[in-house]
Amino acid sequence: MAISFLCFCLITLASLIFFAKKIKHLKWNLPPSPPKFPVIGNLHQIGELPHRSLQHLAERYGPVMLLHFGFVPVTVVSSREAAEEVLRTHDLDCCSRPKLVGTRLLSRNFKDVCFTPYGNEWKARRKFALRELFCLKKVQSFRHIREEECNFLVKQLSESAVNRSPVDLSKSLFWLTASIFFRVALGQNFHESNFIDKEKIEELVFEAETALASFTCSDFFPVAGLGWLVDWFSGQHKRLNDVFYKLDALFQHVIDDHLNPGRSKEHEDIIDSMLDAIHKEGKDSSLELIIDHIKGFLANIFLAGIDTGALTMIWAMTELVKNPKLIKKVQGEIREQLGSNKARITEEDIDKVPYLKMVIKETFRLHPAAPLILPRETMAHIKVQGYDIPPKRRILVNVSAIGRDPKLWTNPEEFDPERFMDSSVDYRGQHYELLPFGSGRRICPGMPMGIAAVELGLLNLLYFFDWKLPDGMTHKDIDTEEAGTLTIVKKVPLQLVPVRVQ
């Protein structure tokens, strides 16, 4: 009898708590939401280019809106003011990450920096990354690698220039950023290693991004294993695991090479730095690293550091070639400032060309490589633009929509670097109308490394070469159609004819 009475009391108490929460939630002022279907929510309203679909929905429902992806509520932010509230005002309360199937797997159960939810372990790893891997001193120590790889690209393009044959600049720039990554992070020379196949690496980057971007039911239908079952039948689990094993084999190979006592060590790379940290374990009790952490960090750099830099350069060259006056102006400044006799560009030359920096800013605005900041998750109740955002709510910031907001930018669809002529707006996370690297505690830690590669790569392309279109093409034929989800590529690869400038 006593047990029955106790059970009755517990059930009654649980019911009261449940309904109290329900009543409290009814009083909340939630963001506006488009009509949704049962079960799937608003998933049917998301097209092949999610950032564009979300932009169009925001134009109708406002810069802060609530969508339902399956059973998961997601708040989408599409204005500078709302982004500032999320990324600065409430940064601490919404700087966690949702635990997704793909990110859990590729980060080796959240042993990385990008995908790990907020907590003491993440704070210690982030501190280590900023102090040891991506600090200014470390970025500068890899300067010779960036300069050598850009010089190698110039030599390759010069050979094509002799024959006046078109080059796939999209592929050339991907290999440039990939070769820099492999030397900086893995200590492997793209051009000398017998282990690394360039074509397979490009394929692996594509597979990894596709697997992460593909619809994973488990993330949106976490009920009674329903999502897991659908993912198993659809092959999504297999795709993610295939990518995981390929990346693991690659990373394990280079880590084993670094652990070889007979290995020659000309320059310290990122794996060396992390292995040193493991050997010194105990001096910093807040940080405990194992080999899985190295692989988690490498996965972050592999996914975020190769494709994004190449895409920024591709979009910049696309817009410049499409606008002959602009490319003439930026090349005129570069060649006037650097002179006509340089055999090799160095990173000291970058500060001499402010117009090129404006071109890069405008590319970040109009063509951010990652149009949606990686999803955040609230850890407490917050208010954004007067709307209530409950705890455990995913938040997406649409930086592409903000970059094309006519309230912020004159003629936002036009590529106009001179809009930054007398502007203090920068891309380092302090100006919320331009957020290619995010902002706040979750800003991309590899930003200095990525910027250095983009600036030097474009400087080489524009100093040493003039660029012509393949026979039969005019500037009007250059399209800017997009493709992709996590990162946005030019749908039709950029084919140009390099003409070496003597």
Curated annotation (Swiss-Prot):
It is found in: Membrane. Keywords: Heme, Iron, Membrane, Metal-binding, Monooxygenase, Oxidoreductase, Transmembrane, Transmembrane helix. The keyword Endoplasmic reticulum does not apply. It is a single-pass membrane protein. GO terms for cellular component: membrane. CDD domains: CYP71-like. GO terms for molecular function: heme binding; iron ion binding; monooxygenase activity; oxidoreductase activity, acting on paired donors, with incorporation or reduction of molecular oxygen. Heme binds at residue 444. The keyword Plastid does not apply. This is Cytochrome P450 71B20. It comes from Arabidopsis thaliana (Mouse-ear cress). The gene is CYP71B20.
